Amino acid sequence: MWTVQNRESLGLLSFPVMITMVCCAHSTNEPSNMSYVKETVDRLLKGYDIRLRPDFGGPPVDVGMRIDVASIDMVSEVNMDYTLTMYFQQSWKDKRLSYSGIPLNLTLDNRVADQLWVPDTYFLNDKKSFVHGVTVKNRMIRLHPDGTVLYGLRITTTAACMMDLRRYPLDEQNCTLEIESYGYTTDDIEFYWNGGEGAVTGVNKIELPQFSIVDYKMVSKKVEFTTGAYPRLSLSFRLKRNIGYFILQTYMPSTLITILSWVSFWINYDASAARVALGITTVLTMTTISTHLRETLPKIPYVKAIDIYLMGCFVFVFLALLEYAFVNYIFFGKGPQKKGASKQDQSANEKNKLEMNKVQVDAHGNILLSTLEIRNETSGSEVLTSVSDPKATMYSYDSASIQYRKPLSSREAYGRALDRHGVPSKGRIRRRASQLKVKIPDLTDVNSIDKWSRMFFPITFSLFNVVYWLYYVH
């Protein structure tokens, strides 16, 4: 019951207040009040000297900064810069622009800003900037009764961002926006972030194709020059590069091409056309990938992380091609030469043996000792005797069927005994040699070279990848 009566009394009291507000708003739009506003603005601008800062000769002017980041359009590694679009607002107090009698803020035409004093703010690391002008110049000037001035601009700036690309593309970059007074020192003007941590907004809404904004910081400081100390505000963005694009465009193709080069180890070694074509194709493809990557990056003096990976892949591909060159040399070059030389030596030895084993006989069947050599070993020396008869008719017989018996000397008997006792030692040597052949591949066997390459290349490439990713990925 009492609650209903209280509500009715509040309604009766608030009704006159609402009527008063409506009347005041209506009176503001009346021609007499519009003329008063016009007279107030004319009075403020009349005699206003834009050449002098507020409170000239007194304390420095405090200028507050606010930034609403609209977008980060591009981050370029080639030019070492980034493009930022923002709503940049500055506020300060100018007692010459204070007014009374109008309980409203005056938002004026953007051309009025040319008739008022504004801070000489500039971006220190700016390369190219402009104020948007569609459909009109995007700037705002707003006056408050106490003389506070709010000056806003919509700006797109391309600012320098010096990047360290040693860990590219697994890197993080810090790009800053430096705001400074060009002419006024700290004796005349002071900069501060208006709103503290909330002075910069819109950063969390930004999405970049190749980067993620991990964090941002606001810094206020003073810098010393020969002409004095100047105020500076710094907005720093910490950008982390997204690796997904580079995995699909660079790392995965390079890895697959490297693996493709190993297919030649399973192709027959006498298929020269297939193996050479595969090796050259993979080498040229790796060269193309490296060239395309260099075109998208600046010419810097140090080695980047992606350069190390591409260089490693190129080395593996090139070694696969050299492996076939080695196999080809063993099979078609050095191997046949050795076989030909051994065959020639063997045929020469057989020919000498045949000539030594041939005897000559005359027509009566008498053996002529013109070419038969009788070797007698006595007291560690050889006695060679030969008799010849040039008049006899000669027939050649193989002396392999002729057997000569002679008693064994003590030296020969001792040598045969040593041979019989030496057989086990030779067997042990052969077994050790066979064990060594299992451990050490025969580099003269082309099949063995390909077989070992099938294991060596994948293992070493996998080890290279493990070391690379463990080092560069945190």
UniProtKB/Swiss-Prot annotation:
GO terms for cellular component: chloride channel complex; dendrite; GABA-A receptor complex; GABA-ergic synapse; nuclear envelope; plasma membrane; postsynaptic specialization membrane; presynaptic active zone membrane. Residues 1-25 form the signal peptide. PROSITE patterns: NEUROTR_ION_CHANNEL. One of its GO terms (biological process) is central nervous system neuron development. The keyword Nucleotide-binding does not apply. Pfam families: Neur_chan_LBD (PF02931), Neur_chan_memb (PF02932). Belongs to the ligand-gated ion channel (TC 1.A.9) family. Gamma-aminobutyric acid receptor (TC 1.A.9.5) subfamily. GABRB1 sub-subfamily. This is Gamma-aminobutyric acid receptor subunit beta-1.
